[in-house]
Every structure is written in C-alpha cells, then in structure tokens.
Amino acid sequence: MKTWLQTTLITAMAVSLAACGGGDDGGGIVPPAPQQPSSIRLADPANGYLNAQTAAAYTYFGSRDTYSLYAISLFSVIIAASQAGPGTVSTNCTGGGTASITFNDRDGSNSITAGDTASMTFANCQENVELAGATLLTTLNGGMSFVINAASGPTANLQDFSFVAAATANNLSAQAGTASMTFNGTMTISKSIPQPDSTLRYIATSNDATVNRNINGVQDSIVLAGWRLDDALSLLTFTDQVSLSGNLNFTTPSGNENLLLTTSSPLIVGATGVPSGGAVAFATTEDQASASFASTGDVTLAIDAGKTGTVTATISTTISALESLFGN
C-alpha cells in the first residue's frame, strides 16, 4: 500500500512540480458553464500573440496535469484497496511526516463495489524523489476523498475492471523547491473494460476542480468548469487519442482567460505526454483560436479575431515553447 499510495503519488506530484520549473460512459455529460468575458484578448498581437500562445499552453498542459493528478490518485487508491482490503493503514514518510489511507467496504464484499468510499491524507509527508538526475524533496499535505459510483469486474486484473468514481481534493498541496501547488474540487472519472477495437475508454468531467500554483514567486490558477476529457487508450500501440471540451479558466499576472474548448481532431499522445498530432480549439467571448500539433514538435496557432470565421493570423511555435510558458 505504501508503494502505491505514497511513492507513486509523490513521484507524480514531483514530476508536475519539476515540469513547472522547480466502465461505461458513466462520466456523464457536464454542460459548459456560462462563459464569462476575459480580461485579455486572444487576438492581441503583442509579443507574437503571446496571449494566444499562453492560452494554448494552459488548454493542453492545464488539462493534462490536473487530470493526471486526480487519475493517478484514484488509481493508486483502487490498487491499494484491492491489495490491502478495508481499514486504515498509516506509514511514516522517509523525510518525516505521515501518509495514510482508509478504505470503507460498505457492503462487506471484500471487493470494490458501488457505494464504497476511501480517503487518503498526508501530514507534512516528505520524500526525496530523483528526477532527471536531480533529487527533489517533495512535501505533501492535505488529502483526497473518493466515492465509487459504479464498479464491475475483478480488481485482480485492473484492465478488466470498469468503474465510475468521484475524487475530491481537499487542500491537497505539494511543494518542491520554489514551486508549490494546491488542488481542490471534484473530478469524476470513468474507465471501461477493453473495447472491440482494443482500446480502453476513459472519461473525466469536472465542474469545480481548481489548481493554485506558485512557481518561483509567480502565482496562477486553473479552474475546470463544465470541463470534459475523453481518452481512448490503444492496447496495441499504447497511444492515447484525447479530446477536450467544456470550459477551462485560468488566471496569470497578465489577466484571466475564460476558454471554451472543442476538439476538431483528437490529440495523439504517446509516452512523452505531449501531442504528436490532432487539433484543439479554444475561444473567449470575443476571439477564438486553434492549435494544431505535428509529430515534429511544431505547433501552428490559427487566430480568428472577433470570431468571424476567418483566420486573421497564423503563428508557428513548438510544444516545448508552450510547455515552458505553462511552467513559468
């Protein structure tokens, strides 16, 4: 249990911080929230259309990193519960503090079924995690609670285990060096059994998942409101086809952008975690733009000032440049 709950999750959090510089279709349809005006324009040409580039960065990396944290947390708890059974287990973290998990088997079936609940809590839990040859001291506090809404299949083979579950972050925070982040809010995640086309289907939705970050003294926030992610993972190629929709709002020192996301062509994502194909569009109440990804790492932004249906500017950038914008 310690391995899955503590080491796996801490490593995932550390990777997120390092990147910052320091089943059924049970997910449900979450309607987009009423879109609010943004304080900055996507179509502002200043600094090479920096606002549009930043919006593209937050659209993909903000969605990916937030979903990954919730998903890894949920999967870790499911694996831990299937291995250890009901009850509470606490462990001491290597650098001090504690990590604990509680699994409540409501029907006494000694398996994961609808109605079961779980929670995990970190109290100043410190671990040294080695990433890219460097040792990163990561401190976790707060926790998450989980509710299994539906489940079927044996947990002994998680590939054949389908579920719908809600994960709620309760001031779950991580700090490493000069970077910190805090998660709050709920995300519902569903997983299918293998489909006839040899894929696993994942759906994630959220109305209020929030991430507050402080990266080298620069603060920002991300809010998923009426947001949805659809992911088809190929069991043959182990690549994902990801579609994003709904609302993603973010605030940086430059202002806020409230984006409505649509995916015209699913994003092709491999082991690197970055798209090598596909296109996603993002719009404010005034402007809209799209980002098309290539296998070379190049990204083309097409900007439509005033949402007239005409491309008014085309910007060339790279996925690494967008990742840097998101991390800083």
Please give the residue ranges for each predicted region.
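C-terminal motif of bacterial Sec signal peptides marking the signal peptidase cleavage site
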Residues: 15-19
